[in-house]
Amino acid sequence: MVMGHYATALIPYAYNSQRKLAPFWMFLLAAQFLDFIMIAFVLMGIESLSPHQFFQASFLNMRVDMTFSHDLLPVLGWSVGLAIFAGIVCKNVMATVWVFSLCILHELFDLAVGFKHYIFGPNTMAFGLDLYNTQPIIGIIIEALVCFSILTWYLKKRSDQGEPVSKNVKIGLYAILVGATVGLLPMANQPLSHFLG
C-alpha cells in the first residue's frame, strides 16, 4: 500500500485539527515510517527491491526483502520506538498512542493489500495476502477504496465539527489519494517501459 498509508494520517488529524495533540507531520511520519525505513535500508543494501530500474517494475514482477523494516517483530520495535519519540516531542500520551497505532495500521494494511511479510525473516511463518504479487489489480482497487473511504469520512467529520474543508482542498485530496492510487493500475501487470515503448 502506498497512498492508503498517507490517508490513515487523516484519522487522528480529524480529532486534532487544532494541533493540540501533535502536528500533522507527526501523523504523516508515523503512517509512512516503515516505508521510509525500507527505502533507507534498500539504499544501504540491507534490504532489497527488484527490479532496480523503476520503468522495469510492475507490481506483479516486483520482489522485495523487507525483513528489518516490515516483518512483524521489527515492526513492533519500530512502532514502540517511534511512539516514544512522539511522546518526547509532543509531550502527549494520546499522540503516542496514535503514532503507535498508525505504525501498526501500516503493517495491517500491507498484509491485506501489499506484499507478504514474515515474523522475522523468510525462514519464519509468512503472513498476508500478497495481492501485489498475485492479484495486483485487486490490491490497487482495494487501496483506492480505502483511500476514498477514509477521505470521505474525514471530510464529513470536519464538516460535522463546523470546520469544513474547502472545495479546492477536497478536490486536491481526492486527486492525490484516490487518483494517484488508480493511476497505478497500468503498472499492475506491466512495467511502465511496456507503455513507453
Show the residue positions of the predicted features.
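N-terminal membrane-targeting hydrophobic helices
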Residues: 1-197
